[in-house]
Amino acid sequence: MDPNMNSLLKWSIKAATEEQSSGENNNNNNSGNNAPADPSRGLTPQMLSTLFGGPSEADLMKAAMEALRSDEVDLENKLIAFDNFEQLIESIDNANNLEPLGLWTPLVELLDHKEPDMRRMAAWCIGTAVQNNEKAQDKLIVLNALPKLVSLATADTTPVVRKKAVYAISSAVRNYQPAMDEVTKSLPEGYSRDKIDAGDMDAVDALMDKLRAHKPTFVTCTVDRMLSPSKPTSSSSGEHVVPLRGTRALRVDRARALTMLASGRHAVTGTRLSYEAQAIRPHLIPK
C-alpha cells in the first residue's frame, strides 16, 4: 500500500475513534465544556494529496527533472523547476528517493551543462541531497561525481558555480571518510595529499576555506575550424596545416588547456577534436 494511503487510513481510524470517545464523554458530562477535537489534526499535505488525487512529491520530482532535460523548456523555467526540485529534496525521504526514481544520474550529468546557472543549481541540489545523508554521499562516489565537483570548484569560469560546488563538496565529505578520500585524490596542484579526517570539522572547514579562496588561472586558446573534413596538408616546415574558417575563443584553466593539448579532446564536452586538435595553440600557458 502507498505509505500516504496507509497513513491516511490510520488517521481516519484514529479520528473516528476519538470522535466516538468524545461523544461518549459529552453524554456523561452535562457541562458540555469539552471542545471538539480538530478533525484536521494529523493530516499532512502528502496525505491530502493522496486523498484528492494530486501529484505525489515523487511525481513532482520526476516532472521537474523532465523539464530540466527538455529542449522545449527555456532557461527561466528550467531554473524554476530546479528551485522546486531543490526544495523537495530538502526532505531526506525525497533525497533517498532520487535513486529508486532514477534521478541521480541525470542530476549529476547537469553539472556539465553549458549554462552556468544550470551547473550552479545542479551543484546546489547535490549539496542539499547529500547533507547528513550517508546513503546519498555514497552515491556520489558510485557516480564518480566528486572529481567533477572538485573541477567545478577550482576551474569553472563562473564564481557562483565554484561557490555551489564547494557547498556540495562540503556536504559530501563531512563525517563520510570515503568521500573525503576521493576528494583529496582529485584536488589540483598546490593542495596537500595528506589524509584528512572526515570527522574533524576544523580540518574539513580549513579545506573548504581554501577551496573558496581558490582563484583559477585562465588561458585563452584559439581553436581553428576546418573548412571541410578533409585531411590536413603539410607545410614546407613539416608542420600540419589545417584549412581555416575563422577562430573561436575558448576560456579554460591552465590544467585544462594542457589536457586539451595532450589528449586532443574538447575541454567542455570531452569529445575528440580530430584534426582540430592539431590547431589548438594556447597564447599563454602561465605556470
Swiss-Prot record:
Name of the protein this chain belongs to: Hsp70 nucleotide exchange factor fes1
This protein's GO CC annotations: endoplasmic reticulum
Domain of life: Eukaryota
Region span, Disordered: 16-46
Family to which this protein belongs: Belongs to the FES1 family.
GO BP term, pick one: regulation of translation
ARM repeats: 32-73, 92-131, 134-174, 192-231
Name of the encoding gene: fes1
SUPFAM superfamilies, per database record: ARM repeat
Any one GO molecular function term: adenyl-nucleotide exchange factor activity
Compositionally biased tracts (Low complexity): 18-34
Subcellular compartments: Cytoplasm
Function: Functions as a nucleotide exchange factor (NEF) for Hsp70 chaperones which accelerates the release of ADP. Required for fully efficient Hsp70-mediated folding of proteins.
Xref: InterPro entries: ARM-like, ARM-type_fold, Hsp70_NEF-Inhibitors, Nucleotide_exch_fac_Fes1
Gene3D superfamilies: Leucine-rich Repeat Variant
Keyword field contains Chloroplast: no
